[in-house]
UniProtKB/Swiss-Prot annotation:
Signal peptide location: none
Active site: D96
Name this polypeptide is given: Putative tRNA pseudouridine synthase C16C4.06c
Annotated catalysed reactions: a uridine in tRNA = a pseudouridine in tRNA
């Protein structure tokens, strides 16, 4: 009696087998989800010919070029190979069109199907020589380089000839002289300005050997210190207003780092900008006003007025091809990595290759193309300089240095 009520083992197995056969189509359609891991990626690149770092549809960018390379080597699953957002690809620092990077750090999710050093080699074989991947390493799944980055360090290589005092008998020298006398003939100047050609507006000695005098160098060093600390940089970007809280930025250091003489006997000054974060065009506009103040001998205290006045100053942007992202800083995040036994974000193992890349693909071409690019020539078109001169005059009521100090800076007798 009990044996009849108890189902046999054979009948139970047979029922399971029938159920599996009935749903064999459903089970065959199930695939194992590929395993992905968050990694950080250390890269260097030359920004010439690219529309910046950030991915932008139908535009050639650094991030898109890297993403396509990762997809081609099989580091990205096929269904995610149409957008970097699907693999959470982001960078520690953003660079604008034409700006280079000695070191930048990206975060992205890649398939855990091959060793990361092997992926680096495969990607570098596909990438153009102006973009290099130096290292990939596993990190936290929540890693976002833009968020955990403490600060960014940029460098700007300024040709010393761009700091040359305007030549006598030029319109620019005439405007400066009249302003120093507190007589500013705007109507007369504008009538002359309309008849100027490009050659008349450009300092013709940009490519000639020129050495920065000690008074000019001291003035430039002092002007750089005015940027340190927390200020409103609304006049140094195109996207923020005076009342916008995000226009307040903290700069840890702005300084003159060193002087360099290239193979054509031209002197360059290296400026360092170290801050928590920077806005669009901020550094290039900071360099632009530093050039103007050093050339004209304007009181460096005027920089404080650009921070504290709601009026937006029309500052011309210095050329982009002389701006380099030196490195992002991850000091706080690396301390966290040591506590949780994760590899810190560092690239000492590739430092030799990075230095060689920076010399061969960034600084040397930058020095060589200085004359042919004509970027500084267009920067010195008097129309742009005249607008800046007007705006500074409105802020300061022509608050120049004392005549004796001004003569020392300008090299006048």
């Amino acid at each position: 009696m009990h044996s009849l009520l108890r189902p046999s083992r054979f009948s139970a197995n047979q029922s399971v087998l029938c159920l599996l056969q009935r749903h064999r189509v459903f089970f065959s359609s199930i695939s194992v989800k590929p395993r992905k891991r968050m990694v950080y990626c250390v890269v260097s690149y030359r920004g010439t010919g690219f529309a910046g770092l950030q991915y932008n549809a139908n535009v050639k960018t650094i991030q898109d070029t890297l993403f396509q390379a990762f997809a081609r080597v099989g580091a990205v699953v096929q269904v995610n190979a149409d957008s970097p957002k699907k693999i959470r690809m982001c960078s520690a620092a953003r660079t604008d069109k034409g700006v280079h990077a000695i070191v930048n750090v990206l975060g992205l999710k890649v398939l855990d199907n091959q060793p990361l050093p092997h992926v680096v080699n495969l990607v570098n074989d596909i990438l153009p020589p102006c973009i290099r991947v130096w290292k990939m390493a596993r990190t936290f799944n929540s890693f976002s380089p833009h968020t955990v980055c403490d600060s960014r360090v940029y460098e700007y290589w300024l040709p010393v000839s761009s700091l040359l005092t305007p030549r006598p008998c030029t319109l620019e020298a005439y405007v400066i002289a009249k302003a120093s006398e507190k007589a500013f003939p705007i109507n007369e100047t504008l009538s002359h300005l309309a008849n100027l050609s490009k050659q008349d507006c450009v300092a013709n000695s940009l490519s000639e050997p020129f050495r920065l005098s000690k008074p000019k160098l001291d003035f430039l060093k002092h002007a750089c210190t005015m940027f340190r600390g927390t200020h409103r940089f609304h006049s140094y970007t195109t996207e923020k207003g005076f009342s916008d809280a995000s226009s307040r930025r903290f700069l840890l250091d702005v300084r003159v780092d060193n002087l360099h003489i290239d193979k054509l006997n031209r002197q360059w000054v290296k400026l360092i900008f170290h801050g928590q974060s920077f806005m669009k065009h901020q550094i290039r506009k900071m360099v632009g006003i530093l050039i103007h103040l050093t050339r004209t001998g304007w009181n460096a205290q005027v920089l404080l007025n650009t921070f504290n006045n709601s009026y937006r100053i029309r500052i011309p942007r210095a050329p982009a091809e002389f701006l380099l992202l030196n490195q992002p800083i991850f000091q706080a995040f690396n301390k966290k990595c040591s506590r949780f036994d994760h590899e810190p974000v560092e690239w000492s193992c590739a430092q030799k290759g990075i230095d060689q890349f920076a010399h061969s693909f960034l600084r040397t071409p930058m020095f060589d193309c200085f004359i042919s690019s004509e970027s500084f020539q267009s920067f010195f078109i008097l129309q742009k300089q005249f607008q800046l001169f007007q705006d500074l005059a409105l802020l300061t009521s022509f608050d120049f240095l004392e005549p004796s100090s001004r003569r020392d800076i300008l090299g006048e007798k």
